[in-house]
Amino acid sequence: MATCSWAATTAAAAPPRPPARCRSRVAALRRTAAASAAAASCVLAEAPKGLKVEQADAVEPAAAAAARRDVGPDTVASIILGGGAGTRLFPLTRTRAKPAVPVGGCYRLIDIPMSNCINSKINKIYVLTQFNSQSLNRHIARTYNIGEGVGFGDGFVEVLAATQTTGESGKRWFQGTADAVRQFLWLFEDARLKRIENILILSGDHLYRMDYMDFVQKHVDKGADISVACVPVDESRASDFGLMKTDKNGRITDFLEKPKDESLKSMQLDMGTFGLRPEVADTCKYMASMGIYVFRTDILLRLLRGHYPTANDFGSEVIPMAAKDYNVQAYLFDGYWEDIGTIKSFFEANLALTDQSPNFYFYDPVKPIFTSPRFLPPTKVENCKVLNSIVSHGCFLTECSVDRSVIGVRSRLEPGVQLKDTMMMGADYYQTEAERFSELSDGKVPVGVGENTIIRNCIIDKNARIGKNVMIMNSQNVQEAERPLEGFYIRSGITVVLKNAVIPDGTVI
C-alpha cells in the first residue's frame, strides 16, 4: 500500500504584512500562482478520469515549486513517548514499560520508532519514560549508545525520566502525553537545539515503517503549524481512535476522540477523494489519528506554555482545540500500521509476522529495524517440524512441532512439544546442562518448555518454566481470568504465561 497525501494549504493565521518594497513582488508571485493553478485546472479537466491523482501531483504551480524549501533532518528533533502505565497490555507490562515489550522474536517495541528515526536520518532523539523503565533504559543504552551501538554523528539519544522539581507544578508526575512534553520544553531552548524548526512526537507502542522526513516535508510544504499522521479505518475499529474530518486541502476541520454512535457516524468521509483505491475507500470511511504529530517548534512552545497550560493530552485536548485557530493538517499514511496497545492486537500482530507475505516485514535491507546485538550462536534444530514460524537466534529445538508461532531468543523446546499460534519471548540467560540436570533431578522445572507439552493460542513471557506433559489450550474458551499465583492470566481468550512463571508438570490450563 502506498503512502497518500494531498495538496497544500496556507496557514490559518495571516502572515505578517510585508514591507512596502516587497508587496509588488508578493503580488506578482500570487498572480503567477493563480495563473499556474488555472492552467493546472485546464489540464486536469482534459485528463482521463483514471489519471486524476497522478496528474494532480504532476502539475505543481510554478510559484509553489519556486517557494518549496527542502527540509533537512538536522532541523528536526523527535520525542518518543514511553507510554503510561500500560494497563491494556498488562500483564506484559507488569515489570516493564510498554516500549520495552518484546516483539517479533528479538526486537522490542521501542526499536520501531528508533529505527524509523535512524532510517529517516533524524538523529536528535529524546525518549520520555515514567513507568517500569529500567529494562527500557538498559536496552536503549546497549543498542543506541553513540560510542558502541548505532552511530549518530552529531546527534544523540537521551532518556528523560519523569522527575519532580521545586514548585507546585513540579510535584506531579506526567499527567498525559502533552504534559510529559511540557515538563521538558526547556530542552528546546538549549543552544545545541537552536536549529530545530520542527518537533516530531512519536508513540512507543506501534508497529509500522514510515519515512518521517516525508511527513515533515509535507508539513512544511503546506505551511502547517501542526500535522497529524492518520490512517483510514473501517467502522468496526473507528471508535477506538481519535477521528478527524478535513477540507479538500487536508486541513483538519473537526476532531473527536473515540466517538460513539451518532458522533461516530458524523465523522464519516469519502476517502476516495484522497486517492485511496476504491476497494479501500468503500470499507474504510474514517480517518483515524496515529498519535504521531509534527509541531513547529515555536507553535509547540506557545501552545503548551501559553494557550493550553493545563491541557494534558495531545489527542483529546491540544489537537482539537488547536484545529480551531491554527493550520492543523492531516497526513494520510496508507502503509501498514498497527496500534498494538492491547493483548489481542499485540498477539495478532506478532502472529501475522509469520505469514508468507506479511504486511510488516522485518527483513527490509534498505530500511532495517535495529535492535541490541546479543552475539548469540545460531539456533540448533534436531528432527523438528517447523511451519510458517519465526525462530530467533540461540534456540534449542529438539524433536518438536512448531506451527505459526514466534520463538524468541534462547528458547528451549524439548522432545514431544507442540506449539501452535504461540508467541514465546525466550529467555534472558542460558542454563548449563549441569544446572538443568540438577533441577530435573530435584523435581524442579528448568527454563523452557518440557517434554510432551502442548500449547495453543498463548503468549509465553521471558524466562518461563513450563514442565512436562502440560496442556495450555484454554479448551473451555475462557475470555478473562487472573491466576497470578499460578503463573498466568487470560486476556481476550489468550493465555499469558507470566515472566519467570513456573508451570508444574501435568498442569492443564
From Swiss-Prot:
Protein family (similarity comment): Belongs to the bacterial/plant glucose-1-phosphate adenylyltransferase family.
Protein name per Swiss-Prot or TrEMBL: Glucose-1-phosphate adenylyltransferase large subunit 4, chloroplastic/amyloplastic
Keyword terms: Allosteric enzyme, ATP-binding, Chloroplast, Nucleotide-binding, Nucleotidyltransferase, Plastid, Starch biosynthesis, Transferase, Transit peptide
Presequence positions on this chain: 1-36
Means of activity regulation: Activated by 3'phosphoglycerate, inhibited by orthophosphate. Allosteric regulation.
Substrates-to-products reaction catalysed: alpha-D-glucose 1-phosphate + ATP + H(+) = ADP-alpha-D-glucose + diphosphate
Function: Involved in synthesis of starch. Catalyzes the synthesis of ADP-glucose, a molecule that serves as an activated glycosyl donor for alpha-1,4-glucan synthesis. Essential for starch synthesis in leaf chloroplasts.
Localization: Plastid, Chloroplast
